[in-house]
């Protein structure tokens, strides 16, 4: 559809915000809007998706694509389960199609982000890609020989819920000790709150006003950037867990490239430096095989929305 003037809206629906962008078929962002996600109210979230889409829609828009965290049925666009949100069986695609009258598709947010990076970002030109979005939790997507690997039921890529410690923290999926509890924003926040309790003189404790419940992942990251050794230690530990898991996945999948998106990328080398070091150690016989680059998503926070928009336009052809 290149050169046709066709445009699409891409939505990235997360636990805290719902972002919409309008893009050309070449991936050029023309407009954007973001609204808070009413995460505990499914109907309010569906209505927010309509509202944020209307704010960027024009007559040139031919389709809408949605990327949402959780298990999404690709054929129906229904979100069946979201471990970090109070949603079950949400008719994402159908609600927007009915409300706006435009063909709408929905997919897992990591699949959408991976597709964006594959088509227009850090993985352009690669055929075998492992994408991991490490934000509040961890989502994953696998591109094999240029195609998204979806599995028998369309739910492939839920790497954040690999159990690494059965006695570990309770996860939103209902299990204990999932990888995302050690290598994502969950881990940073949990460790930051514990540090605020155990180290009352730390920058983390001062920045939260002495109330550990006020500690967030960004607060820990900001403290680390300001030189706080406790915060830096937290990011390093989470980074090592991230890299170890990525190395294990690379052993299974043998990708050309590993792309990391989400809040982990925003933390920069304070987290990704330790991640890269443990990633190399975790790869089997790393000295005897081609190196696997571990890079950050070049589309940044737009990766999921751009990828969803590209998916929607491709569905029209």
Predicted region positions:
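A charged helix-plus-loop insertion that forms the helical arch/lid used to bind
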Residues: 78-88
């Amino acid at each position: 559809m290149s050169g046709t003037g066709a445009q699409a809206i891409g939505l990235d629906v997360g636990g805290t915000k719902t972002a919409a962008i309008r893009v050309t078929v070449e991936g050029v962002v023309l407009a954007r809007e973001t609204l808070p996600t009413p995460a505990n109210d499914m109907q309010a979230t569906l209505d927010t998706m309509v509202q944020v889409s209307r704010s960027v829609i024009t007559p040139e828009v031919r389709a809408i694509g949605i990327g949402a965290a959780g298990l999404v049925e690709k054929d129906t666009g229904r979100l069946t389960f979201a471990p970090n949100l109070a949603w079950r069986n949400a008719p994402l695609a159908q609600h927007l199609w009915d409300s706006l009258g435009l063909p709408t598709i929905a997919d897992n947010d990591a699949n959408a982000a991976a597709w964006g990076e594959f088509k227009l970002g850090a993985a352009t030109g690669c055929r075998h890609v492992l994408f991991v979005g490490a934000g509040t939790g961890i989502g994953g997507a696998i591109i094999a020989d240029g195609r998204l690997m979806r599995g028998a039921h369309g739910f492939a890529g839920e790497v954040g819920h690999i159990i690494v410690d059965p006695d570990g923290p309770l996860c939103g999926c209902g299990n204990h000790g999932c990888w995302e509890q050690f290598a994502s924003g969950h881990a940073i926040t949990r460790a930051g709150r514990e540090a605020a309790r155990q180290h009352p003189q730390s920058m983390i404790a001062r920045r939260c006003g002495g109330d550990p419940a006020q500690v967030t992942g960004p607060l820990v990251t900001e403290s680390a950037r300001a030189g706080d050794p406790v915060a830096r230690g937290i990011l390093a530990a989470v980074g090592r867990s991230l890299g170890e898991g990525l190395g294990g996945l690379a052993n299974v999948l043998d990708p050309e490239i590993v792309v990391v998106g989400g809040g982990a990328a925003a933390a920069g080398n304070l987290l990704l430096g330790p991640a890269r070091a443990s990633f190399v150690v975790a790869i089997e016989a790393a000295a005897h095989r081609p190196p696997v680059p571990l890079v950050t998503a070049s589309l940044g926070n737009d990766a999921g929305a751009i990828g969803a928009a590209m998916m929607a336009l491709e569905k029209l052809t």
